[in-house]
UniProtKB/Swiss-Prot annotation:
Name of the protein in its database record: Calcium-dependent protein kinase 23
Source species of the chain: Arabidopsis thaliana (Mouse-ear cress)
GO cellular component: membrane
Compositionally biased intervals (Basic residues): 1-10
A GO MF label: calcium ion binding
Residues binding Ca(2+) 3: 454, 456, 458, 460, 465
Modulation of this protein's activity: Activated by calcium. Autophosphorylation may play an important role in the regulation of the kinase activity.
Quaternary structure, from the entry: Interacts with SLAC1 and ABI1.
Region (Disordered): 1-21
Length: 520
């Protein structure tokens, strides 16, 4: 669930009135890391690929990025495209290239978002804590964003790798994050998707700078405007976003959630699905009772509470966070935080990967009754009976079955479904991407997913079985598989039994009745 975000707009209905589009999670732009040996698969000019609107998105002539850069290994893959390492031909300098497939931008809204992302990165160019954009290019098939390569990895990866942690270290981290928030706000930008995955270290050096990336959901601040787009990622979204009336204060809330996780290893709000997380966020009850909170300083808890204040008008500002005694006054102690916090953080990260895999494999075993009308919907869209649907067929289906599927849901399918990046969605990808409707956290569905992964039916998922499934569903590299096994296998026998599997599926999302966190 941590690797999902939503983007929804108010739209006009046929009668001219405004209707709300429901909250439906969709996948964020850049997701799991992939092996070094994978090479870019840029669509060949010889392969005809349909683009709905022949006009350019960036408003400038098409350019072949390969005239200026050689594209190397794949760094990450998301709903809209792929990020590669690239080398500038003229200088030999190394950058990252985010290639966004135009065929996945199914609406004018999506195209505007890409333009806004580029404009915001250009606007913030030169700011030390912001990933620098080098240039943007467009060809018939993709929009390419060339930007600074941050080789130091994600925030949580660095913290976990260090193996030790303190409040003083957490204070330094949150200062860097809120520095970014202040820079954005002073320059008239709301980020709207602050989360640990979007903070990268510039290099592997110990003193490397922490930088913010991914402005795909960001917006320019307009004086007096009340924002209504439901955007962000479930664990980190502010309550006023869910109420569809907010401003720049939402970034402080998200930073507060990150601080809470830094101090205890788990998010402050969880439930058994995304909708349940939203309910808990709206309740806004913060737990400072369970371990390790009794040993966390009062000053740290005071700052968390002020950053997670429900009323945005009363919430602390970025400038006030930076002046808080825990940040500026040296009140954050250097005493190491309990090692279980790092353990929980690792499990929280691994849980997201395993849940994503389980959703995909569960789609295979859903009954006709559980799938309800989705099979018919897929068949109606698959007009040539090829067993797959293209984005154009998906759009046509939207027009023909408007009462059955909203444009937001189609965008969700586009960004979340096409696992192998081949430009089409097969039946099980389609079902998997809509499975949030079917309460698949229930034990019966968890058991079905476990059985699917347990190929030899011996009651355990082995490393080979997990590796096979993760690669089959386009999710696995060696590091990801090793991480999931090590975090789920609580009895250290090298295998995952059903109880371990079920516990991980509920980790970080099911509110415990006792006084224990879901991660131990």
């Amino acid at each position: 669930m941590g690797c999902f975000s939503s983007k929804h707009r108010k739209t006009q209905n046929d009668g001219g009135g405004e209707r709300s589009i429901p909250i439906i999670p969709v996948q964020t732009h850049i997701v799991d890391q992939v092996p070094d040996h994978r090479k870019p698969q840029i669509p060949s000019p010889s392969i005809p690929i349909s683009v709905r609107d022949p006009e350019t998105i960036l408003g400038k002539p098409f350019e072949d990025i390969r005239k200026f850069y050689s594209l190397g290994r794949e760094l990450g893959r998301g709903g809209l495209g792929i990020t590669y390492m690239c080398k500038e031909i003229g200088t030999g300098n190394i950058y990252a290239c985010k290639s966004i497939l135009k065929r996945k931008l199914i609406s004018e809204l999506g195209r505007e978002d890409v333009k806004t992302e580029i404009q915001i990165m250009q606007h913030l160019s030169g700011q030390p804590n912001v990933v620098e954009i080098k240039g943007s290019y467009e060809d018939r098939h993709s929009v390419h964003l060339v930007m600074e390569l941050c080789a130091g990895g994600e925030l949580f990866d660095r913290i976990i790798a260090q193996g030790h942690y303190s409040e003083r270290a957490a204070a330094g981290t949150i200062k860097s994050i809120v520095d970014v928030v202040q820079i954005c706000h002073l320059n008239g930008v709301i980020h709207r998707d602050l989360k640990p995955e979007n903070f990268l270290f510039s290099s592997k050096e110990e003193n490397a700078m922490l930088k913010v990336t991914d402005f795909g959901l960001s917006a320019f601040i307009e004086e007096g405007k009340i924002y209504k787009d439901v955007v962000g990622s479930p664990y980190y979204v502010a309550p006023e976003v869910l109420r569809q009336s907010y401003g720049k204060e939402i970034d402080i809330w998200s930073a507060g959630v990150i601080l809470y996780i830094l101090l205890c290893g788990v998010p402050p709000f969880w439930a058994d699905n995304e909708e349940g997380v939203f309910v808990e966020i709206l309740k806004c009850k913060i737990d400072f009772v369970r371990e390790p909170w009794p040993s966390i300083s009062d000053s740290a808890k005071d700052l968390v509470e002020k950053m997670l204040t429900e009323d945005p008008k009363r919430r602390i500002t970025a400038a006030q966070v930076l002046e808080h005694p825990w940040i500026k006054g040296g009140e954050a102690p250097e005493k190491p935080i309990d090692s279980t916090v790092l353990s929980r953080m690792k499990q929280f990260r691994a849980m997201n990967k395993l849940k994503k895999l389980a959703l995909k494999v569960s789609a295979v075993s859903l009954s006709e009754e559980e799938i309800k009308g989705l099979k018919t919907l897929f068949a109606n869209m698959d007009t040539n009976r090829s067993g797959t649907i293209t984005y154009e067929q998906l759009q046509t289906g939207l027009s023909r079955l408007r009462s059955r599927l909203s444009e937001t849901e189609v965008q969700q399918l586009v960004e979340a479904s096409d696992v192998d990046g081949n430009g089409t969605i097969d039946y099980y990808e389609f079902i998997s991407a809509t499975m949030h409707r079917y309460k698949l956290h229930h034990d019966e569905h968890v058991h079905k997913a476990f059985q699917h992964l347990d190929k030899d039916k011996n009651g355990h998922i082995t490393r080979d079985e997990l590796e096979s499934a993760m690669k089959e569903y386009g999710m696995g590299d060696e590091a990801s598989i090793k991480e999931v096994i090590s975090e789920v296998d609580t009895d250290n026998d090298g295998k995952i039994n059903f109880e371990e599997f079920r516990a991980m599926m509920r980790c970080g999302t099911t509110q415990p009745k006792g006084k224990q966190y879901p991660f131990h």
